[in-house]
Amino acid sequence: MTEHTVSHANGSDLENAKKTYMLANNQKEIERMKNQHEWIKGSFGGLVKAPIDFDKKNQSILDSATADGTWLMDVRSLFPPETELIGFDIAPELYPPEGTRPRNVELVTADLLQGLPAQWIGRFDLVHQRFVFPNFETEVIREVLGRLMQCVKPGGWIQLVEPCAGENVSGPEPKWFLLLHKLANQFMRSAVPRDAILAILHEEGFVNINIESLDIVIGKHQRNKEMDARGRRSMRDSVSNMYPMITAEQLGMPKEEARAVLDKFEADMQKYRTAVRHVIIWAQRPE
């Protein structure tokens, strides 16, 4: 299998980007992402919504912002062993050691903001990405999504998984849980990237555009106890990651209350019906 790499004229660009990479490169972060993976997979009932042929041999799949490669390693079991699976991320520190990876899985370093390898253009039957676009403003989403769409071969599919973290689907009562949306709107450049994604897909001529929207219930009213445990952990992690970066004044509450936010957040999940909306969007490049 051909080894793909991306080089830059100024090597410091990639190093600077790594320094600003949002994810902590350690085992705790890998465990957080694996829990999130299982939560989204279990909630939506699977990994792939695009109607790709799971039995066809010699297909190529690209996973953008692959992190530790969890999605790619999991989806591998759905396809024949001849399937080519490539994942890329800006920082390779989370990648499993090369000797532990299946032969048809390749993890490389590339930067969505700097451009992708020319040999990827029109190459992939499925291009997948999740939990990336909230970090970008609409114009950057347009630029990045354009690069990913170029990687889809004629007749192939792109699939995007994103939260709608800025939308309240829990009602007004769980005021501490609603802090999640306040933090999202404070820190995310696009707390609800759904509409921008759909508009860009339409504008660029992709067809068979579909969206599955799911309000994933968390806490007391989630009947599936495993999904409840995974969802609560994922929400706690999200709030814990954002909370230290904002002051009590920005939250509009006394410091004493701010110190107890995480406990009250947990209590709201146990008392009220709380949920977070996520979407999966998939679309096809015309033949």
Swiss-Prot record:
Disruption phenotype: Completely abolishes the verticillin production. Pathway: Mycotoxin biosynthesis. Its EC number is 2.1.1.-. GO terms for biological process: methylation. The keyword Methyltransferase applies. It comes from the Eukaryota. GO terms for molecular function: methyltransferase activity. InterPro entries: SAM-dependent_MTases_sf (IPR029063). Pfam families: Methyltransf_23. Keywords: Methyltransferase, S-adenosyl-L-methionine, Transferase. Induction: Expression is regulated by the cluster-specific regulator verZ. Belongs to the methyltransferase superfamily. LaeA methyltransferase family. N-methyltransferase; part of the gene cluster that mediates the biosynthesis of 11'-deoxyverticillin A, one of the dimeric epipolythiodioxopiperazines (ETPs) from the verticillin family that act as mycotoxins. 11'-deoxyverticillin A is required for normal conidiation. The nonribosomal peptide synthetase verP is speculated to be responsible for condensation of amino acids to form the carbon skeleton of verticillin, whereas the cluster-specific tailoring enzymes are involved in further modifications leading to the production of 11'-deoxyverticillin A. This is N-methyltransferase verN. It comes from Clonostachys rogersoniana. The gene is vern.
